[in-house]
């Protein structure tokens, strides 16, 4: 693993903001460690209950897929896989490059659908903000896009503020959300990340 940056993470029990770390260059051992600690808590009924992060390793290193993890106190709090080779579908920015969030997941103890006692709050928001920062670093002006699981649609539209571009019939009927440069700049500024 390689430390990429520190990010703020809020501990629910005390409200304290702690410094967590985003790491890149994750390997099979890192993913197995995360999965083994998550598996006990991950509800099998969840839409993403079948995901296996260790299956993502073969696609890494292709130059377009990148995998990152958010760690605090030697424990993985969330994972995100991004693709760096996608373009916008929005009429206002059609064809412009952006970062595609292929998979994103908070540890089960950080998901309100998995537990009634959350450990940290905002893990998904932090990982999405990190994807926006990757987009800025790549010269894509912070633009990001993703297909949402049904249970997360309101999170992306209401909490993150992404634009809902409708159902993508070519991608399992999932809704397609995009965050433009002005939206991401506003989002990152509100959180003190730029």
Language model regions located:
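Non-catalytic substrate-recognition and accessory regions of acyl/acetyltransferase enzymes
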Residues: 1-118, 126, 133-143, 151-154, ...
């Amino acid at each position: 693993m390689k430390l990429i940056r520190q990010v703020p993470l809020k501990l629910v029990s005390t409200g304290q903001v702690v410094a967590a770390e985003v790491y890149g260059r994750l390997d099979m051992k890192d993913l197995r460690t995360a999965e083994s600690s998550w598996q006990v808590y991950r509800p099998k009924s969840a839409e993403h209950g079948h995901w296996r992060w260790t299956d993502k390793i073969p696609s890494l290193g292709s130059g377009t897929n990148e995998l990152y993890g958010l760690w605090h106190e030697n424990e993985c709090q969330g994972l995100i896989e991004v693709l760096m080779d996608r373009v916008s579908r929005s009429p206002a920015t059609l064809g412009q490059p952006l970062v595609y969030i292929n998979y994103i997941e908070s540890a089960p103890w950080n998901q309100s659908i998995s537990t009634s006692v959350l450990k940290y709050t905002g893990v998904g928001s932090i990982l999405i903000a990190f994807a926006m920062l990757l987009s800025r670093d790549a010269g894509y002006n912070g633009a990001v896009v993703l297909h949402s699981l049904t249970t997360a649609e309101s999170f992306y539209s209401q909490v993150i503020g992404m634009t809902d571009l409708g159902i993508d019939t070519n991608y399992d009927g999932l809704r397609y959300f995009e965050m433009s440069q002005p939206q991401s700049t506003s989002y990152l500024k509100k959180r003190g990340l730029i």
